């Protein structure tokens, strides 16, 4: 019978072989906090950047963001574009849904004058354009909105009642086989937005599935499930959504982390709201009753007033964000411990304190 030491050696050899064959990050311990040294683009949400383990979405990889309608998928990707443009990166948006609003994009901080936009006629054209942009090596971030709208040419040219079983899945599988190597070589981030469908006849387990077959699930290094969990109200008026994102797959750090943040209408992700929540959670912002204090100074009664103070003092907000980013990305064990402690205290999640 093999000893513990022999088993550990055999396991280490097996893990080494798997990583050699399938790439680093293809297998890891669930509690492993070690992240790969990969260049990342911020999502615009500090808590999501921390949950991803590397400070954002990984360059040179495929990412899938999926969720129900109006859950914040496009808002999140536009936020990624805004952050990438701040770093001088070139971005492209392949709008297969023909629904991109330039005014809304500009409100989220996107430089619409520098953003490359394509509205293709069919799925083949969209993926060929994506392939050409990746091969150029000059584009850093490409968003495809959405997989469900990548309609094969044969379906568009056919009759309404014609059956086109598996056409889109085959199209995606072929395109991803072609794209994946080029994406790695050009160090380009390609984000596919996807929609949710219900599987018919599922009695047990989750009936939800994403469109476009299974290929994207395999090729994606990161998969994010985004959901709206509630409304944010100011009096009787609804001013935004409470949003929850779960990292359902992550090949560059530990998966299955979950974060909550707010998306405000016309503004996008509420950065000041996140700073207050994370600041309190990691003891950089003090909370006594309804009062919030930062650096020993009271900054507001109630979360809305504390957020307003940070908006009026951008230098203090930037200093707090820098402190949090440096501390949490450098100490992922602390993040994991804080998440476990929070889950033990309450399973209700974050609530809007307005």
UniProtKB/Swiss-Prot annotation:
The gene is recA. This is Protein RecA. Pfam families: RecA, RecA_C. Can catalyze the hydrolysis of ATP in the presence of single-stranded DNA, the ATP-dependent uptake of single-stranded DNA by duplex DNA, and the ATP-dependent hybridization of homologous single-stranded DNAs. It interacts with LexA causing its activation and leading to its autocatalytic cleavage. Belongs to the RecA family. It comes from the Bacteria. One of its GO terms (biological process) is DNA recombination. NCBIfam families: tigrfam_recA. Keywords: ATP-binding, Cytoplasm, DNA damage, DNA recombination, DNA repair, DNA-binding, Nucleotide-binding, SOS response. Transmembrane segments: none annotated. HAMAP family: RecA. One of its GO terms (molecular function) is single-stranded DNA binding. The keyword Cytoplasm applies. It comes from Pasteurella multocida (strain Pm70). The keyword Flavoprotein does not apply. It is found in: Cytoplasm. GO terms for cellular component: cytosol. InterPro entries: AAA+_ATPase (IPR003593), DNA_recomb/repair_RecA (IPR013765), DNA_recomb/repair_RecA_CS (IPR020584), P-loop_NTPase (IPR027417), RecA-like_C (IPR049261), RecA-like_N (IPR049428), RecA_ATP-bd (IPR020588), RecA_C_sf (IPR023400). PANTHER family: MITOCHONDRIAL DNA REPAIR PROTEIN RECA HOMOLOG-RELATED (PTHR45900:SF1), RECA (PTHR45900). Its main location: cytoplasm. ATP binds at residues 67-74.
